[in-house]
């Protein structure tokens, strides 16, 4: 199967998981990116079962609304039973690198509220150690250079994310993103806490403190379900 076919496979598997485990009338947390889009497309077929969704980005909001799925602000919701999102990398403990699509801060906020985080990914995203995929850090623009120096001191190579025309990429929150290459993150929780403490960091794209509860992993043999132990 192609990577796109694997994404559609796990998108449908996530919709099936929601149908089986989330009661009718609930609100679903939805992530951002190409794999999350496959979940949205599958969810659209059963949208009448649920009140709607909480979105993690402007792009996701637009896709949900295009399917006629009502979008709630997180502040309107008392509880969120499930959050479904992709990952750029996921390790054996359920820690992830996320943020390739630029929505890491809102993704982390919505994930933190959800009872269950369901990661959906193709098999190439499973890694023994996080860091081959550049680690995104959303930063306040004036802190970009200072954060870059801190990253360099840890052995990373900071690269400012830019648009096709060479301008700094701007997040939905009005900030910039540094993508850090050359890392091997043996202690995701510790590294997440360390970077998040730097002045000027909005959030780092490490999801270790709030990692996945389970992963639906698309493989040539079908969908593999991996359950991670509670922290």
From Swiss-Prot:
Pathway: Carbohydrate degradation; pentose phosphate pathway; D-ribose 5-phosphate from D-ribulose 5-phosphate (non-oxidative stage): step 1/1. It catalyses: aldehydo-D-ribose 5-phosphate = D-ribulose 5-phosphate. It holds the Pfam family Rib_5-P_isom_A. Signal peptide: none annotated. The keyword Isomerase applies. It is an enzyme of class 5 (isomerase). Substrate binds at residues 32-35, 85-88, 98-101, 125. The active site is at 107 (proton acceptor). Its EC number is 5.3.1.6. GO terms for cellular component: cytosol. CDD domains: RPI_A. One of its GO terms (molecular function) is ribose-5-phosphate isomerase activity. InterPro entries: NagB/RpiA_transferase-like, Ribose5P_isomerase_typA_subgr, Ribose5P_isomerase_type_A. Keywords: Isomerase. One of its GO terms (biological process) is D-ribose metabolic process. Homodimer. Belongs to the ribose 5-phosphate isomerase family. PANTHER family: RIBOSE-5-PHOSPHATE ISOMERASE. This is Ribose-5-phosphate isomerase A. It comes from Burkholderia cenocepacia (strain ATCC BAA-245 / DSM 16553 / LMG 16656 / NCTC 13227 / J2315 / CF5610) (Burkholderia cepacia (strain J2315)). The gene is rpiA.
């Amino acid at each position: 199967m192609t990577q796109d076919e694997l994404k559609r496979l796990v998108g449908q598997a996530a919709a099936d998981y929601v149908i089986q485990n989330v009661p009718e009338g609930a609100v679903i947390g939805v992530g951002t990116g190409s794999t999350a889009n496959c979940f949205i497309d599958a969810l659209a077929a059963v949208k009448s079962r649920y009140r709607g969704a909480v979105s993690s980005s402007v792009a996701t909001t637009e896709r949900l609304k295009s399917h006629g799925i009502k979008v709630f602000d997180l502040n309107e919701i008392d509880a969120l039973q499930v959050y479904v999102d992709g990952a750029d990398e996921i390790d054996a403990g359920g820690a992830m690198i996320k943020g390739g699509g630029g929505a890491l801060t809102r993704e982390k906020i919505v994930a933190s509220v959800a009872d269950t985080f369901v990661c959906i990914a193709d098999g190439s995203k499973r890694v023994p150690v996080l860091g081959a995929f550049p680690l995104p850090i959303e930063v306040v623009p004036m802190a970009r250079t200072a954060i870059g120096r801190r990253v360099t001191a840890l052995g990373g190579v900071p690269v400012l994310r830019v648009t096709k025309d060479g301008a700094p990429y701007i997040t939905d929150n009005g900030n910039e993103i540094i993508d850090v290459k050359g890392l091997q993150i043996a202690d995701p929780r510790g590294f997440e806490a360390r970077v998040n403490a730097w002045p000027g960091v909005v959030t780092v794209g490490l999801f270790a403190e709030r990692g996945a509860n389970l992963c639906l992993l698309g493989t040539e043999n079908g969908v593999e379900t991996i359950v991670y132990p509670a922290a």
